[in-house]
Regions:
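N-terminal accessory interaction module
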Residues: 442-539
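Acidic, Mg2+-coordinating active-site environments of NTP-dependent enzymes
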Residues: 138, 161-247, 261-286
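ATP-dependent carboxylate-amine ligase catalytic core
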Residues: 22-37, 63-154, 173
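Beta-strand->loop->alpha-helix junctions that form or flank phosphate-binding loops
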Residues: 71-73, 196-197, 209-231, 249-254, ...
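Short functional linear segments
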Residues: 1-46, 53-66, 110-111
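Conserved, mostly hydrophobic/aromatic
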Residues: 481, 546, 550
Length: 550
């Protein structure tokens, strides 16, 4: 089984549970000799901020010298991002091994009418890998809720509920209290549950979790303060308890991130107590400062000010608006795309009034129609609202509208952020292909199917570049390269959420035709065209070759 085939199998699994609960994950883990019994776990639940909190907790524990696993969702470029050990993604070989072993059992369960979901299986894969990697502790971000979430198959030594707001009401309940009750179920047996919740949510958590440590800006067991912003993406923070305190910096901004940092400090101290590890203030401060977390008020450019944020519900949008208020900029240009099950009007109402909006559709089957999103903004009083399609084009449109000193903000979903980030993080790699052996090695590394590799290997005699693209962009580039007279080989269709490796080969003339077509089409691939032209040397003043494969 090739890696892309393993990923395709995972992504083809259903997305919604037939039978809520942890029994299915527990049964799958039993096929792997119950690896969850061999690892110390931390669970982080919450409506917002649980990913950031999990990352900060992991960073502090690593700074303490522990081998630490981290499980988060969703991923930006590859499913391997979801499971990491000491910052390194789960290897492709481990993904293949897990799927090869699990597939017969999973197929049999599906045939019996009791299939597992993608999230359940990937959660089991992460837990198995953490045991295989002999981690000292693993931090798990809860997917949804708490009590019935797949991650609750473990018995955590420490756990948190970052906060509670109305979300996933069809599954979790119609009130904050109902949702809080389900999230409180992650409470560990021997440590207080840590929470940044307030009001009715906190009262409910106290009723159902027993002992609780509260973290907040006022009237809490652990008090936090967000200090001055040091840079666009770093701020000072203080965390003060009765017998310890931390004065440091975090690579995240906003009062809510200060609360998350406080929760992470308490969790890390609880784990250290359980494992008998020393954890002083200096270690906490150093760990927090290394906890970079993409897609959370991530500044991509400073003039115009371009920000990507995964705010995906009204509460997160309200927090984002508060952070924005601390920045000086001219006009505000929004790029907005969200899933269909969100409260779009409440999200829009929580945001500052925009000067322009481009509504778009992330490449996900749950994405809301951009026409619907545009109408929501119009009904809320926005004047300049444009209906776009793909995220890349929407970002390009908003950026073209922005003058110096303006702000471009892309938000609404982490799926949107994942696609938007490609504008800045995409790499086009020149490859030195001297002979058939080099071509074979390249195509194998790119996970190109055997038949396509055999055809492409014979043609890899000109310039060769490798890049990773979203699924629909990969299809567009493939068709354009073939039309241009070049050759293109892609990894098997891994599906939504997984970038496809694309290997292009051809003469300079073929690359010229390809990039000219991509730049002219309205598919948001003009930036890709520019990167490819630069990579193969088409923009060299002397017209000569760049240092690429020949």
């Amino acid at each position: 089984m090739q890696y892309h085939e393993a990923v395709r199998f995972l992504l083809d699994l259903r997305r919604f549970q037939v039978k809520p609960g942890t029994e299915s994950v527990r049964s799958l883990l039993a096929e792997f000799d119950d690896p969850h019994e061999d690892v110390t776990f931390v669970q982080v639940a919450g409506s917002n901020g649980k990913g950031s909190t999990a990352r900060m907790t992991e960073a502090v524990l690593r700074e303490a010298g522990l081998t630490v696993g981290l499980y988060t969702s969703p991923h930006f470029e590859t499913v391997r991002e979801r499971a990491r050990v000491d910052g390194r993604k789960i290897p492709e070989s481990a993904v293949r091994e897990f799927v090869e072993r699990a597939k017969p059992w999973l197929v049999e369960r599906a045939a019996e009418g009791d299939p597992l979901t993608f999230f359940e299986v990937v959660t089991a894969m992460a837990i198995w890998y953490f045991a295989e990697a002999e981690t000292d502790v693993a931090v798990l971000e809860v997917g949804m809720g708490g009590k019935l979430d797949a991650t609750s198959v473990v018995d955590p030594v420490a756990a948190a509920v970052t906060n509670v707001s109305l979300e996933h009401t069809a599954v979790l309940g119609d009130t904050v209290a109902e949702i809080a009750e389900k999230k409180a179920a992650v409470a560990p047996a021997n440590q207080p549950l840590v929470t940044g919740a307030t009001g009715d949510a906190l009262a409910t958590i106290r009723d159902h979790a027993g002992s609780v440590v509260t973290v907040g800006t006022d009237d809490a067991d652990v008090t936090v303060r967000a200090g001055e912003r040091v840079t666009h993406q770093e701020s000072a923070v203080s965390v003060v308890a009765d017998d310890w305190r931390v004065e440091g910096r975090i690579p995240l901004v906003g009062d809510y991130q200060a609360v998350n940092a406080g929760i992470a400090c308490v969790l890390a101290r609880q784990v250290a107590d359980e494992l008998g590890v020393a954890l002083d203030a200096t270690t906490l401060e150093r760990g927090l400062r290394t906890a970079h977390w993409p897609g959370r008020f991530e500044v991509m450019e400073t003039d115009p000010f371009v920000v990507l944020d995964g705010a995906h519900n009204p509460s997160a949008c309200e927090s984002l608006a508060t952070v924005l208020d601390d920045f000086d900029f001219g006009a505000l240009h929004l790029v907005f795309g969200a899933m269909h099950d969100k409260d779009h009007r409440a999200m829009v109402d929580a945001l500052p009034d925009p000067d322009s909006v481009v509504a778009c559709r992330p490449d996900n089957p749950r994405s809301e129609d951009p026409e619907t999103l545009a109408r929501v903004f119009e009904n809320a009083g926005a004047d300049d609202v444009t209906v776009g399609d793909d995220v890349a084009s929407a970002v390009a449109t908003a950026s073209e509208r922005a003058d110096e000193g303006d702000c471009v903000l892309a938000l609404g979903s982490l799926f949107l952020v994942a696609e938007a980030r490609q504008t800045w993080t995409r790499t086009v790699t020149p490859v030195d292909v001297r002979d058939r052996t080099d071509a074979t090695d390249l195509l194998e590394r790119a996970h190109v199917a055997d038949r396509d590799a055999a055809e492409a290997r014979e043609e890899c005699v000109h310039r060769v570049v490798r890049l990773s693209l979203q699924r629909r962009d990969a299809r567009t580039v493939t068709e354009a390269m073939l039309t241009a007279g070049g050759d293109c080989a892609t990894a098997g269709d891994a599906g939504n959420g997984e970038l496809a490796d694309v290997v292009l080969s051809g003469t300079l003339a073929a690359f010229d035709r390809l990039t000219t077509r991509l730049a002219a089409d309205s598919d948001g691939l003009a930036a890709v065209a520019a990167d490819v032209r630069a990579c193969v040397g088409l923009d060299c003043d002397a017209g000569g070759d760049a240092d690429v494969g020949t």
